Amino acid sequence: MSSKLYIKTFGCQMNEYDSAKMADILLSEKNMELTEVPEEADLILFNTCSVREKAQEKVFHDLGRVRHLKNSKPDLLIGVGGCVASQEGSEIVRRAPFVDLVFGPQTLHRLPELIDARRRTGQSQVDITFPEIEKFDRLPPARTTGATAFVSIMEGCSKYCSFCVVPYTRGEEVSRPLDDVLTEVAGLVIQGVKEVTLLGQNVNAYYDKTSGEGDIDFATLLDYIHEIPGLVRIRYTTSHPREFTARLIETYQRLPKLVGHVHLPIQSGSDRILAAMKRGYTIIEYKSIIRKLRTIRPNISISSDFIVGFPGETDTDFEETMKLIDDVKFDESFSFIYSPRPGTPASDLPDDTPYRIKLARLHQLQEKIQRNAQMISQSMVDTIQRVLVEGPSKKDPNEFCGRTDNNRVVNFAGHAGLVGSFVDIKITAVSSHTLRGEISDMQ
């Protein structure tokens, strides 16, 4: 008889991918099936994120909410994975002795062994080491039932931006071998996947020196993936401006499966702040990348990340960020007020900007980008867009939704037989964050 697994995932798409891999390996080796009800679970896992402030406290809050379940189910195991686990390690067990397992992003493949050790010894198990590529070598083949899938091609970060905790929680950059990536993508396509999103903390830093084909950079990897029969679309996230090479830009000219959307975090429009962040590029260099991309694909959609209120940010610095938004015409952003992360260089910088000013700046920035997004969406009304139908709409379960090439979500009337296929949708209206449409050829 199978036992039940409950996973709560926080943070980025990489964590979503990792959670799916946890489920795969525990099904394969422990015959565990997923449940959405924690009370049913024999194993509860929290896959955590430490990018934002107070992430640790949120984890302990969630742990407190499930602690009582052990009273009625003494054999229940509770585990904490992800970046908070990497950052806090044994401190989690010290503060919450009822936690049985603590494991980092690079050791999730050892979950079956950690479970066995916990049951055998009665002691909490902590493993937050950084084995190089062992994680991917140990994972079972990917399983999916949808038309889209994530594929992790590299992990970690070697940039050490002054504000960022990722190098300390995910380790240095490590790329998967070319053959492993191609095998996973091809296997997903056989299962019905039409679109893959390639994942990495700095996905375009991918570099495989082990291939028999010679050194493989990210642009070359895209060339190989593009040749896989049955795959229709390729996305990737998150890219870094420092590795957005001329070769990568050229792929948008020769690879039609590469979608017309790029998420390219800038963080600030001020060269002074970018230098303090240790980002390694200037505004002119960033805008040059965008200009070259739009020369090849004039309608390409550009989204970004912004940090508002970084230590020392002046009104002038913020005005430069707003000007950059006007110049580039970003149509989506993930934007936050700076929050110091323990152990990062920026956490030691003096920060005398009042919170109310930071909050006002954030609202101004988000409103400007939302206006840009609305203008771009409005320009799509009455056009025909090719949409991959992903499933029922989140807004109305009687309708369906899918994504355009430029990453817009479209809601429309349809039927279940369309899921997993491409349909031509005429865009009829725009809402705050999505489009409405109708099937143009009544497929």
Curated annotation (Swiss-Prot):
Primary enzyme class: transferase
Domain (MTTase N-terminal) ranges: 3-120
CDD domains in the record: Radical_SAM (cd01335)
Domain Radical SAM core: 143-377
Residue numbers binding [4Fe-4S] cluster 1: C12, C49, C83
Domain TRAM: 378-441
Keywords, comma-separated and alphabetical: 4Fe-4S, Cytoplasm, Iron, Iron-sulfur, Metal-binding, S-adenosyl-L-methionine, Transferase, tRNA processing
EC number: 2.8.4.3
UniProt KW Iron-sulfur keyword: yes
Reactions it catalyzes: N(6)-dimethylallyladenosine(37) in tRNA + (sulfur carrier)-SH + AH2 + 2 S-adenosyl-L-methionine = 2-methylsulfanyl-N(6)-dimethylallyladenosine(37) in tRNA + (sulfur carrier)-H + 5'-deoxyadenosine + L-methionine + A + S-adenosyl-L-homocysteine + 2 H(+)
Binding site for [4Fe-4S] cluster 2: C157, C161, C164
Main function: Catalyzes the methylthiolation of N6-(dimethylallyl)adenosine (i(6)A), leading to the formation of 2-methylthio-N6-(dimethylallyl)adenosine (ms(2)i(6)A) at position 37 in tRNAs that read codons beginning with uridine.
Entry-linked HAMAP family: tRNA_metthiotr_MiaB
Family according to the record: Belongs to the methylthiotransferase family. MiaB subfamily.
Descriptive protein name: tRNA-2-methylthio-N(6)-dimethylallyladenosine synthase
